[in-house]
Amino acid sequence: MFSNKKKVILVISISSLIFFLIFNQVKSQELRVIDGDTINLDGEKIRFTGIDTPELKQTCIKEGVKDPCGVTAKKILIEKIANNKVECINEGKDQYKRILAECFVNDKSLSSYLVRSGYAFAYRKYSKKFIKDEDYARLNKIGMWSMNFEYPWDFRRNN
């Protein structure tokens, strides 16, 4: 039915496929979103660099109605990373011993995404990297830019 040459090729092909499937499995990640700019990835607490999101207990006002903008920032991040592998570039540690990093999903910056969504701010005190993303959200009145809000750093200082 099959020549010896075809049998050998078939065995090699099947063996190669099995090898590929076994050794190219993506390592599963243990990932938990803490708030809009902090995650726990494989047991490490990671704070996104260059951005600041509203605190979880922080609210904004839109047309006289309170919006839980801190919770919304967290939800946006959860939705963006759901069922995706998160990769981070470590940039050091902060005073709270958190890893400072820029993190990505499908090679796209989560920080840039959050700022352009209007639920994170370019943290100019530490980086100028996301200013253009913030300008885009502000000019288009996206997210918090369509509301009355307090900057997260002011909220923390006042509360």
Language model features with spans:
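Small beta-barrel nucleic-acid-binding modules, primarily SNase/OB-fold domains
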Residues: 1-159
